[in-house]
Amino acid sequence: MGDQKLTGRVTIPTDIDVVPETLELMKRWGADAIRDCDGTDYPEGLKDVAAKVYSTYYTTRKDNEWAKANPDEIQQCYIMTKFYTAESDKLSIHLMTGIYPEMLKVNSHDDIRRWWEVIDRTTGEVVSCDNWSYSEETGDVTIDPATPFHDYTVSFLAYIMWDPVHMYNAVVNDWKDVEHQITFDVRQPKTHKFSMERLRKFCKANPHVNVIRYTTFFHQFTLVFDELAREKYVDWYGYSASVSPYILDQFEKEVGYKFRPEYIIDQGYFNNQYRIPSKEFKDFQAFQRREVAKLAKEMVDITHEEGKEAMMFLGDHWIGTEPFMDEFKTIGLDAPRHRDAGLCRVKCAEQLQQAPSCGPYPRLRRRRYS
């Protein structure tokens, strides 16, 4: 190929304080695209650059004004307490023990008798709703009567008050005085309408952007932090944060049977990759993939109508958009014409972002996600 200069399939992440370095790296590496990142701003000096401009786009966060005005449509997840052994005929369990308090908030707004579940883990039996109560004041569930020396757990819904990815980035990068981004639910009626209008406004307000880089769509994989802001439980394929009474009501209508929290909780294993999934959990996954793909296609269609390309980041809020499942190809994204090759650019950008410093070119962030 001689001295022919090759370019393409490399995306450079940037920020307002590294414009010269970005241009130099583009030249050295033959990059053909530039993008911003979570926690950065796209530089004015690169808006007319001779490359495609990608914009990270967050469908479920970065608008706390909306989230706070519509608390009933904040995203939710299922949480299970640890196992507690009854030492007498009465047992109290504090729901938020071992969980970072600024990340989650117990959802006692919706019918707790319908959407929570207390289980005697020694026998596997569900404790009757008549035999337990919840105190808003203490945050405790009290089981009365309990069977002495039996183990009990409580499965409950919680609002996601700090987006897990934003929290990770803030903690790892030691961001100071950053408002916690609340995760809102695009699946629900008011937020759905708002989100489609928000996307159109963004496209029109950013004519320099060629590609909307969705990060990702609607539901975060399972990522929960403990009371010290450490990762408590992580499952890149976990569905426990893709739930709400609104979604679960729809699921029940489709499958024709009543939903149980245990379909998600799975004795505390949360249906991780080492478990054999139940029929009910596979039904739930299939339902989620269909609904997520349908809604994602709506956003991709708007992107195309506004004259831009649509690309998906593989990770973060990707639940229901798994590229190895059949529903993915119905979304209509531009990049992934081939399942693997189409996503190479995205992962390459992530790897460059995490690379160690190279001479005068500093690593932009220690960020792992987004």
Spans of model-derived segments:
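Glycan-processing catalytic domains of CAZymes
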Residues: 1-370
